[in-house]
């Protein structure tokens, strides 16, 4: 595996030196961040181009998924999360899509403009493979709040693409009765979104189809590396990022831990500290804390 990864890195560097092109639009990075590109990646499923911040670093990448109040043009991981500086020089690429606010990064049954699972698991990795020389699979997905859910779901349902999942303050048991009610109420309050358009009404049962807790055995069977962080403190410096439901995420993360262990999972790091913010004051340094694990899993 290490030999294959070394070969991929060598081929990626060689390809990059010949200037792989694409239809992306490059923009100037912010002054304090490591140099990165602002790409516009086409999404046929959503019928529009999606803004993606991209930091070249190797053939395997970490995909960073925002909290509920995701930035429309630049990922909050780039701005509040300082992700480009944190991950620069580590031998991996960084992929941070914007525009996924109040979406759960899933495919909505009744909203064609929200087909995030298709974009993140197929359209985006295929585009990056063709236009930036990345490997088609073997990546990591990391996210906060709704992004924590999205990261775990991508790894569970698309193991050919993602071999690492990191969740911070994530909603990892959405089909739980208390949780689906909290998500529905919070997304309506903060985003004006009706979640019946996502997976239908919770009582119809389709929320379970998309639930990492229900499908934790897939993560265990594939030996996917998982990292879960959620503080005992239910406070959130930015309530909109957590749709006012930080306590629900805390409970979800612990229930997910118990389920993961019960189905034989043994490749996880779980941290439930007494202190910490369900917000960027903790999520940004937590990305640094897990960066060694990410690199070890995908580089």
Curated annotation (Swiss-Prot):
Which N-terminal residues, if any, form the signal peptide?
Answer: 1-26
Instruction: List the InterPro entries hit by this protein, alphabetically.
Output: AB_hydrolase_fold, Esterase-like, Mycobacterial_A85_antigen
Q: Which UniProt keywords apply?
A: Acyltransferase, Secreted, Signal, Transferase
Location of this chain's protein in the cell: Secreted
- Transferase found in the keyword field: yes
Q: Per its UniProt record, what Gene3D superfamilies does this chain match?
A: alpha/beta hydrolase
Superkingdom classification of source: Bacteria
Record keywords: Transferase included?
Answer: yes
Describe its assembly.
Homodimer.
What PANTHER family would the database entry show?
DIACYLGLYCEROL ACYLTRANSFERASE_MYCOLYLTRANSFERASE AG85A (PTHR48098:SF1), ENTEROCHELIN ESTERASE-RELATED (PTHR48098)
Q: What does this protein do?
A: May have a role in host tissue attachment, whereby ligands may include the serum protein fibronectin and small sugars.
Family statement: Belongs to the mycobacterial A85 antigen family.
Instruction: State what protein this is by name.
Output: MPT51/MPB51 antigen
Origin species: Mycobacterium tuberculosis (strain ATCC 25618 / H37Rv)
